[in-house]
Amino acid sequence: MDENKIKDAVRMIIEAIGENPEREGLAETPDRIARMYTEIFSGLKEKPEEHLKKVFTVNNDDIVLEKDIQFYSMCEHHFMPFYGKTHVAYIPNGKVVGLSKLARTVEVFAKRLQLQERMTVQIADSIMDYLKVKGVMVVIEAEHMCMTMRGIKKPGSKTVTVATRGIFKNKIEFRNQVYEMIKMK
């Protein structure tokens, strides 16, 4: 990531909106934003397979669900945050992954300029491809600041996206079971 280009661009934006980039409250803002972007876009340097390669053998073909994985991401259309919860369910095919690895996989894709719809598919595809599971279902529920702060201004509205692969694609009873598990306290 080119932090110097980010700093220059932020200075230009500050000037373009009619502010003084040298005034006390703004003088260090380009540096802060460059450091922040390095952090919040760190998923661009990571690959999901780095987190999905360590598996454990099991004799289980029941649904595994990691729910309420909190995330934040940045909308690529408006450069504004969206945030919420991801629920990842899969049916093992003789192997499971450590639960933290599912959350790390979510992070890899969330820490990029993103569309929620694409992120949902990317998470599902990576789990299907690298874990070779019988099926995977990913549900993401998120609030988009571009809907809250600008445009239509509807705070509290949520977007829900779902991606299903393998056995979840054709078996509504498995999808319904995941929805019921997500509702559990």
From Swiss-Prot:
The keyword Iron does not apply. One of its GO terms (cellular component) is cytoplasm. It catalyses: GTP + H2O = 7,8-dihydroneopterin 3'-triphosphate + formate + H(+). Disulfide bonds: none annotated. Its EC number is 3.5.4.16. One of its GO terms (molecular function) is zinc ion binding. Pathway: Cofactor biosynthesis; 7,8-dihydroneopterin triphosphate biosynthesis; 7,8-dihydroneopterin triphosphate from GTP: step 1/1. Keywords: GTP-binding, Hydrolase, Metal-binding, Nucleotide-binding, One-carbon metabolism, Zinc. HAMAP family: FolE (MF_00223). Homomer. This is GTP cyclohydrolase 1. It comes from Clostridium kluyveri (strain ATCC 8527 / DSM 555 / NBRC 12016 / NCIMB 10680 / K1). The lineage of its organism: Bacteria, Bacillati, Bacillota, Clostridia, Eubacteriales.
